[in-house]
Swiss-Prot record:
Entry's localization field: Endoplasmic reticulum membrane; Golgi apparatus; Secreted; Melanosome
Keyword Metal-binding: yes
Pfam families, alphabetized: EF-hand_5, EF-hand_8
Signal peptide: 1-19
Name of protein: Calumenin
Provenance organism: Oryctolagus cuniculus
Residues that hold Ca(2+) 2 according to the record: 117, 119, 121, 128
Positions of post-translational Phosphotyrosine modification: 47
Length: 315
């Protein structure tokens, strides 16, 4: 599907969404849950497996023998030990957990990378991205499908330049990831806020007032009463979003809204795994300590079978 087809589809989806005025649009970027399992090690280590590996990868370990599981875990530990000092710290484990949870992002980047690295030099320049994404627009600057492609291209170029740390208009894979998924990078958060404000700020005064805030998430349907969640959002705006009580949100207030400082579940899980596995209590883990507790980190056919026995007995 090319960009034109995608945007036409997006237009239809948008129109469909607007026809459902009680549906709420969520602009807030939350950290994803580490697992949808209950975190209760007395019952099972399923939560820990999902957190450490990601839910999909965790399923593959359930098919392995204990020996295979330990061998594969040992290889993972070598990747987690970023400074190669033979130990895994809480910070290294936290970084790994965050990577495992966001593996889908890197898979998305890999898919898009192949379509934009046109000269296959391991980099994506702005020219390559522009030509691959907007090439036909340059040939036909006034398409009749209602989208302002030039404006979209200007916005993309601004974001590309922000992601491009060294300013050479050529993105490494990490910079390209920041371009495609800016909410995942601290240095890109200002552009996320700026783009959000541009989307919502209809009168162009550089702020988001109450009506713009509500109008972005709710399309009023004639004489129908507002749903309760809209009334709640009005109260949220007045009581919490508009911190200085001037009737509108500035950049900092918008940032606090869409990029909240959530509880760091990855760090909490990393500390839990270290605490449970650290046999000599030195605050860090060796490969041997991790592999000895393989059932906590990754599981196998044996741990899965044991869990099944527990559930059968309970039944």
């Amino acid at each position: 599907m090319d960009l034109r087809q995608f945007l036409m589809c997006l237009s239809l989806c948008t129109a469909f969404a607007l026809s459902k005025p009680t549906e709420k649009k969520d602009r807030v970027h939350h950290e994803p849950q580490l697992s949808d399992k209950v975190h209760d090690d007395a019952q099972s280590f399923d939560y820990d497996h999902d957190a450490f590996l990601g839910a999909e990868e965790a399923k593959t370990f359930d098919q392995l023998t204990p020996e295979e599981s330990k061998e594969r875990l040992g290889k993972i530990v070598s990747k987690i030990d970023a400074d190669k000092d033979g130990f895994v710290t809480v910070d290294e484990l936290k970084d790994w957990i965050k990577f495992a949870q966001k593996r889908w992002i890197y898979e998305d980047v890999e898919r898009q990378w192949k379509g934009h690295d046109l000269n296959e030099d391991g980099l994506v320049s702005w020219e390559e991205y522009k030509n691959a994404t907007y090439g036909y627009v340059l040939d036909d600057p006034d398409p009749d499908d209602g989208f302002n492609y030039k404006q979209m291209m200007v916005r993309d170029e601004r974001r590309f330049k922000m992601a491009d740390k060294d300013g050479d208009l050529i993105a490494t894979k990490e910079e390209f990831t920041a371009f495609l998924h800016p909410e995942e990078y601290d240095y890109m958060k200002d552009i996320v806020v700026q783009e959000t404000m541009e989307d919502i700020d209809k009168n162009g005064d550089g702020f988001i007032d109450l009506e713009e805030y509500i109008g972005d998430m709710y399309s009023h349907d004639g004489n129908a009463d507002e749903p309760e969640w809209v009334k709640t959002e009005r109260e949220q705006f007045v009581e919490f979003r508009d911190k200085n009580r001037d009737g509108k949100m500035d950049k900092e207030e918008t940032k606090d809204w869409i990029l909240p400082s959530d509880y760091d579940h990855a760090e909490a899980e990393a500390r839990h795994l270290v605490y449970e596995s650290d046999q000599n209590k030195d605050g860090k883990l060796t490969k041997e300590e991790i592999v000895d507790k393989y059932d906590l980190f990754v599981g196998s056919q044996a741990t899965d079978f044991g869990e099944a026995l527990v559930r059968h007995d309970e039944f």
